Amino acid sequence: MSALIIFGLLIALMLTGMPISISLGLTVLTFLFTMTQVPIDTVALKLFTGIEKFEIMAIPFFILAGNFLTHGGVAKRMINFATAMVGHWHGGLGLAGVIACALFAAVSGSSPATVVAIGSVILPAMVNQGFPKQFGAGVITTSGALGILIPPSIVMVMYAVATSGMVVTGPDGQPVSSASVGELFMAGVVPGLMLAGFLAFTTWNRARKFGYPRLEKASLRQRWTAFREAAWGLMLIVVVIGGIYAGIFTPTEAAAMSAVYAFFISVFVYKDLTLRDVPRVLLSSANMSAMLLYIITNAVLFSFLMAHEGIPQALGEWMVNAGLSWWMFLIIVNILLLAAGNFMEPSSIVLIMAPILFPVAVRLGIDPVHFGIMIVVNMEVGMCHPPVGLNLYVASGITKMGITELTVAVWPWLLTMLAFLVLVTYVPAISLALPNLLGM
């Protein structure tokens, strides 16, 4: 009964057009102060302890790094490098767009930032080359979603924050720890590269089928020049992932390092940003960070309410007693997350749903790391379909296309992503191969 009241109130508030963060906060406070006896000082304490986790500090740093890279000319040089490598294949610039998105995803941690950085440069070039605008928009909208799967990923940090500290037990009754940010980052490498390959194949196949243009093959000298110019940006991938794996720094420290590195190469190496531009980038990053931290704060309260009412535990008991197998549970989770993607953005979905679904998943024997990657892939799909697919709106602003037209344009790649979602869901080895290899 408590669950029905809580979710009914939350949905009712969201249907009024109220921001999700405020809807969460009002739902929690209304329920706590009218239907429970929880002391107000406990609620206040939970607000503060919920956002003092060390991992949360990674979010503003990755946002800052992504903003420096977006405005600092790194994307342009990555596109030139990708074009020099694959521009002569079928769909040349389209393939270069997929690869450039994958490379930029590995330094930004954000899908919208990837779409803006790569799309604003390569989409006009594709139209000038003779590609249909719909083709270019489909490539960049979906490939930009790699920004939250290829590490570093802000959504992975959200999942780790949402599930950290939870006391959950596996099917044998033994306690199971939640996934760390480092484990999730390493787990995202193989799925991220695989999805990039799937999207690249879809792009190549459609370009070959419809006879879209390709560029002349670049010489070795041109490729070397393009690589040398992009090397400073590419080194950030080594700094973040290599530093975490080598144990030089934690994911949060890696985020801070990436922000400093991105500032340095944008201002002093590539010089596409001046010191006068830095306050504007800092303010933009602060605005986005504040918005996410406000959502996190209210989501922490919501998770506290769920735990206080015993909803995740009751859901787990019901599913186990009903004889629900792990693969049936994952079907339900995928449908639930894809449906949630129709009216909520990824950060809110992860912060609300992960604390509820995570204990049930662990109870059914599903690995926390694998479950996290599956949720992230679901969020990728949600960012590319209406009505609130964030990548669609970002791409719409770049291409000046309507959302309906863009929705039709992305379907071939969206179907590829759905097929990949099924693969990731039922082949855990894809997510767990690298963490297991590294002994994590």
UniProtKB/Swiss-Prot annotation:
Function description: Part of the tripartite ATP-independent periplasmic (TRAP) transport system DctPQM involved in C4-dicarboxylates uptake.
Membrane topology note: Multi-pass membrane protein
GO molecular function: transmembrane transporter activity
Source organism per UniProt: Rhodobacter capsulatus (Rhodopseudomonas capsulata)
Keyword set, alphabetical order: Cell inner membrane, Cell membrane, Membrane, Transmembrane, Transmembrane helix, Transport
GO CC terms of this entry: membrane; plasma membrane
Name assigned to this protein: C4-dicarboxylate TRAP transporter large permease protein DctM
Subunit structure: The complex comprises the extracytoplasmic solute receptor protein DctP, and the two transmembrane proteins DctQ and DctM.
Family: Belongs to the TRAP transporter large permease family.
Disruption phenotype: Deletion mutant is unable to transport succinate, and does not grow on D-malate, L-malate, succinate or fumarate as the sole carbon source under aerobic conditions in the dark.
Subcellular location: Cell inner membrane
Gene that this sequence comes from: dctM
Domain of life: Bacteria
InterPro entries: DctM, TRAP_DctM
Membrane-spanning intervals of the chain: 4-24, 54-74, 89-109, 112-132, 148-168, 181-201, 230-250, 255-275, 291-311, 318-338, 349-369, 370-390, 410-430
